[in-house]
Amino acid sequence: MSRRCELTAKGVQTGHKVSHSNIKTKRRFLPNLVNVTFLSDALGRPVRLRVSTNALKSVDHRGGLDAFLAKASIAELSPKAAELKRAIAKKKAGEPAAAAS
């Protein structure tokens, strides 16, 4: 399992740990990832993703998973999240036609 957010592509960064005597040693800054189950309104089912806490805040700010994925570019999404975005778009495209009938 990679240490990368499935929604924002936030990953591991490298840098230096600097001691009191200014000796620099390499270190890794790991993203704060959590396993979360989102409810998709369009799909009508729960979706489990591994996301950063920053992404959780962004999803909440945009009004849910469906709204977040609608605005996100496919390039920054994981394959699983990109497939979800396509499925949600397909489902929403089919809704107006079903309502008009």
Curated annotation (Swiss-Prot):
Q: Which SUPFAM superfamilies match?
A: L28p-like
One cellular component term (GO) for this entry is: cytosolic large ribosomal subunit
Family affiliation: Belongs to the bacterial ribosomal protein bL28 family.
What protein name is recorded for this chain?
Answer: Large ribosomal subunit protein bL28
* Residue ranges the record marks as coiled coil: none
Biological processes per GO annotation: translation
**Which residue spans traverse the membrane?**
none
What InterPro entries would the database entry show? Ribosomal_bL28, Ribosomal_bL28/bL31-like_sf, Ribosomal_bL28_bact-type, Ribosomal_bL28_sf
Domain of life of the organism encoding this protein? Bacteria
Its gene is rpmB
Could you tell me which Gene3D superfamilies the record lists for this protein?
Answer: Ribosomal protein L28/L24
Name the keywords, alphabetized.
Answer: Ribonucleoprotein, Ribosomal protein
Molecular function (GO) terms for this protein are: structural constituent of ribosome
